Amino acid sequence: MDFYREEDYGLYALTILAQYHNIAVNPEELKHKFDLEGKGLDLTAWLLAAKSLELKAKQVKKAIDRLAFIALPALVWREDGKHFILTKIDNEAKKYLIFDLETHNPRILEQAEFESLYQGKLILVASRASIVGKLAKFDFTWFIPAVIKYRKIFIETLIVSIFLQIFALITPLFFQVVMDKVLVHRGFSTLNVITVALAIVVLFEIVLNGLRTYIFAHSTSRIDVELGARLFRHLLALPISYFENRRVGDTVARVRELDQIRNFLTGQALTSVLDLMFSFIFFAVMWYYSPKLTLVILGSLPFYMGWSIFISPILRRRLDEKFARGADNQSFLVESVTAINTIKALAVTPQMTNTWDKQLASYVSAGFRVTTLATIGQQGVQFIQKVVMVITLWLGAHLVISGDLSIGQLIAFNMLSGQVIAPVIRLAQLWQDFQQVGISVTRLGDVLNSPTESYQGKLALPEIKGDITFRNIRFRYKPDAPVILNDVNLSIQQGEVIGIVGRSGSGKSTLTKLIQRFYIPENGQVLIDGHDLALADPNWLRRQVGVVLQDNVLLNRSIRDNIALADPGMPMEKIVHAAKLAGAHEFISELREGYNTIVGEQGAGLSGGQRQRIAIARALVNNPKILIFDEATSALDYESEHIIMRNMHQICKGRTVIIIAHRLSTVKNADRIIVMEKGQIVEQGKHKELLADPNGLYHYLHQLQSE
């Protein structure tokens, strides 16, 4: 459906917003159901239509200065029907990125122009999935269900901690008795009894402490395994656009933040929190000994807290800077190792080394600033501790001299105060770890809170036959990016061999990405056997589509495992048959290990042509009903290409084949050749038919290659 009429702008906007939330839309069906008079959707009809798509839509009135706090994109509703979509706001520059429904293109508006168009009415739109996602986002609250799940283990840890605190409470009392009773009365028999009892208490304390550490480490390890498994599953479920918009090093750096969370969970910080919980009991006993000395200890706590509150924001900023520098280093390292052949071929090692040295210096400098600040924080805590110790000693001595406190009671009080202050000091000293794990949770949340490809509610349709239809396709990779495909209409019949040619950047490969459902078009539908791919389960679809790219990646496994990657239990006969069709069987047979040869990382142990033939065999082995060759033979030598072309009739038999190529000789025998230019189909026909038009783009490209 084409949205050129002004009264259809509301329906067009709903289509775009629904597709933004990965919800398939049939515009004709919505128009038939909700636009009964053919005059466009009014506000009530628009909200009902949104509700029918399971979108949560709500009309609000907002002043311009409050727009920075709303969730975007949102529809700006105008009474004259000239609605537009607000996608982004730059508060500092006072600029607004909108999607113009009239021109089908993004526009950047200055403040004055936006004010002239904005009438104060907005429709906020969210999907149920996004609302659930926000409620279930990954942050510190994610660990609460995990704690509840393992509550039995944590209760056991709590019970052990209670006994440890009881022993910690008994030990000072033993010392008090020894100082005040045994030494004064020279009670050797009492001393022996107390010594044996103290030894038993110490032994139990050591055993229980070790048991608590073991139980706690065991439970946190389980949580760590769950988090790691969830992270990897989520990472693989992310859409292809997530990886295309981020550097590999950034993603790797975020995944490595799991190590920081693991160290925090298995460290002493959380057990210190348990110890701190029992401080109230110790305070009660200390108050019984001496209210004055207890007030000194209590008075020190705000200083510990104040110092931590003061240092935390600065530490967090420096940790952010350290992470950013580390991510830059990770990205540069991955890029350098991946492009090592290019670096050596161009002899640019000195330039790369110089860049690395600068980035490494920035990272080390950022790390040094973090360490320096952390040291200052720890020394501040130690200073407060020493001051409190001096005051306690001075005041305690006065109380002993005045007869208000015995020497044994003073020693016992100091031991009890140590039990209270020790976890406080440990927590204060571990504040850097807490700040670091907070950064790690945020960084990891960038991965875990990113929406995955939507599978829920998607249809797993029957085995596909191979009919493909592009209907009024308009597509761009980002809302503010140029249009890649514009008004593309194309029907491909089952079993047809289609060649697609055109200049670089004309949108050839983008068509195949839409077939694989890596993206959903901004407007229009991609249909396979009449089924809208926006409604289809991506995994169901991709299992039935074979794809061979210009640069294919092999995994560090055997040739057999690479060919049978989608079905490891596949019979050897099928693997060999696919390899023969791809022209790979002969060179594989000549290898010492044959099909069991390990190809190395990314297939480094093979030549480019050999890697490509294995990739073709991998695409053929599952007998896909749709086969896509995206410049698949451009990296082959002439002999290998000749083998592939010789087998092409057998390869294409019983399936729909799409061949994207710059070399026109590759597609000249196709049933139909599609010629693309600037995102549109400008010509189509057989090889001879297209050559017959001297003014056509195909004829022009053929002439260039003939020369």
Curated annotation (Swiss-Prot):
Residues 154-436 form the ABC transmembrane type-1 domain. The sequence shown is that of serotype 9. In strain CM15 (serotype 1), disruption of this gene prevents production of both RTX-I and RTX-II toxin, and no hemolytic activity in mice or pigs. GO terms for molecular function: ABC-type transporter activity; ATP binding; ATP hydrolysis activity; ATPase-coupled lipid transmembrane transporter activity; peptidase activity. The keyword Calcium does not apply. Changing R517V: In strain: Serotype 5. Keywords: ATP-binding, Cell membrane, Cytolysis, Hemolysis, Membrane, Nucleotide-binding, Transmembrane, Transmembrane helix, Transport. It comes from the Bacteria. Residues 468-703 form the ABC transporter domain. One of its GO terms (biological process) is killing of cells of another organism. The chain crosses the membrane at residues 158-178, 188-208, 295-315, 387-407, 410-430. PROSITE patterns: ABC_TM1F, ABC_TRANSPORTER_1, ABC_TRANSPORTER_2, PEPTIDASE_C39. PANTHER family: ATP-BINDING CASSETTE SUB-FAMILY B, BLL6336 PROTEIN. It is a multi-pass membrane protein. The lineage of its organism: Bacteria, Pseudomonadati, Pseudomonadota, Gammaproteobacteria, Pasteurellales. Homodimer. Changing A692R: In strain: Serotype 5. It holds the Pfam family ABC_tran. This is Toxin RTX-I translocation ATP-binding protein. The gene is apxIB. Residues 1-125 form the Peptidase C39 domain. Involved in the transport of the toxin RTX-I as well as that of RTX-II. InterPro entries: AAA+_ATPase, ABC1_TM_dom, ABC1_TM_sf, ABC_transporter-like_ATP-bd, ABC_transporter-like_CS, ATPase_T1SS_HlyB, P-loop_NTPase, Peptidase_C39. GO terms for cellular component: plasma membrane; type I protein secretion system complex.
